[in-house]
Regions:
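Conserved coil-to-alpha-helix start sites within the AMP-binding
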Residues: 1-5, 20-24, 149-167
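Structural core segment of the AMP-binding/adenylate-forming
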Residues: 9-83, 97
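Conserved G/P- and acidic residue-centered "switch" motifs that form tight phosphate/ATP-binding loops
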Residues: 11, 111, 168
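Rossmann-like NAD(H)/NADP(H) cofactor-binding core
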Residues: 15, 118, 145
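Residues at the C-termini of beta-strands that transition into short coil/loop
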Residues: 62-66, 82, 88, 150, ...
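Conserved pre-ATP/AMP-binding loop-to-beta segment of ANL
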Residues: 79, 86-107, 114, 139-145
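Conserved AMP-binding A3 loop
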Residues: 103-130
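Conserved AMP-binding/adenylation subdomain of ANL enzymes
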Residues: 126-145, 153-168
């Protein structure tokens, strides 16, 4: 989940993508969102390889792996996640921005046409996550375990990537 914090923390937008979208919908979503970097699990390499020519705005692909576990693939310029973070300065100065700045982006399933984008601000993300922590809502606590059943690309994962750490 560190990407949730890192991406929105630098002022970028964390766009989680539904890998079950059709080829056409996936192309639409990636291009409509202007995704410049795609982080992907190794299991999604075939999906990206089949679509990569249709993503002209995407300039970087990062596999969630270390150098030792990097597979051969046909994704130009692909890099491994561990190499990316190891190149960064540990003394990063976090930017400041308005709480209404965009933080997350999810798309609907597109049952009535192209998927629709839903943009979440930092403020809405915090409020959504805090609401999940309320006793009669999610009733999260340090002594509890959370098994998310909602996909990360659905409704910003119901705030779970942020609510769980808030709860300890």
């Amino acid at each position: 989940f560190e990407l949730y914090f890192a991406i929105s923390g630098i002022g970028a937008i964390c766009h989680t993508i539904n890998p079950r979208l059709s080829s056409e919908q996936l192309t639409y979503v990636v291009n409509h969102a202007n995704d410049s970097i795609i982080f992907l699990d190794l299991t999604f390499i075939p999906i990206i390889e089949a679509q990569i020519a249709k993503f002209p705005k995407t300039t970087r692909y990062v596999l969630m792996a270390d150098r030792e576990h990097m597979p051969q693939c046909n994704i130009p310029g692909v890099m491994c996640y561990e190499d990316l973070i190891n190149k960064q300065d540990e003394d990063y100065i976090w930017p400041e921005f308005d709480e209404n700045t965009a933080s997350g982006l999810c798309y609907t399933s597109g049952t009535t046409g192209n998927p629709k984008g839903v943009l979440y601000s930092h403020r809405s993300t915090v409020l959504h996550s805090l609401l999940s922590c309320i006793y009669n809502s999610g009733s999260f606590a340090p002594s509890r375990k959370i098994l998310p059943i909602v996909p990360l690309f659905h409704a910003n994962a119901w705030g779970l990537p942020y609510a769980a750490p808030i709860s300890g």
